[in-house]
Swiss-Prot record:
Its EC number is 7.1.1.-. It comes from Staurastrum punctulatum. The gene is ndhE. Belongs to the complex I subunit 4L family. The chain crosses the membrane at residues 1-21, 30-50, 60-80. This is NAD(P)H-quinone oxidoreductase subunit 4L, chloroplastic.
Length: 100
């Protein structure tokens, strides 16, 4: 059971990294970042249940990470929406708001 969970978590994390490095769309990049966090959560819960099945520290920490990821997604989507209103594009290569 541990091996399957670790393989699934690593697969999700690698898929997120691949999508983050190849994506030109900000929303797709944000979704890939969330995918990476979900892969980390799966590995965290798998290790927690394997090492100490009586305590739920890993599960509590995973729920905390999910809450932080939800806040990060809301803030990220608000920033992307603001950029789209100003630039009419959400492509990462056209994102140069911080340049003089």
């Amino acid at each position: 059971m541990l091996e399957n969970s670790l393989i699934l978590g690593a697969y999700l994390f690698c898929l997120g990294i691949y999508g983050l490095t190849t994506s030109r769309n900000m929303i797709r990049a944000l979704m890939c970042l969330e995918l990476m966090l979900n892969g980390v959560n799966i590995n965290l819960v798998a290790f927690s249940s394997f090492l100490d099945p009586d305590k739920i520290r890993g599960q509590v920490f995973a729920i905390f990470i999910i809450a932080i990821a939800a806040a990060e997604a809301a803030i990220g989507l608000a920033i992307i929406l603001n950029i789209f209103r100003n630039r009419n594009s959400i492509r990462i290569d056209q994102f140069n708001l911080l340049k003089w």
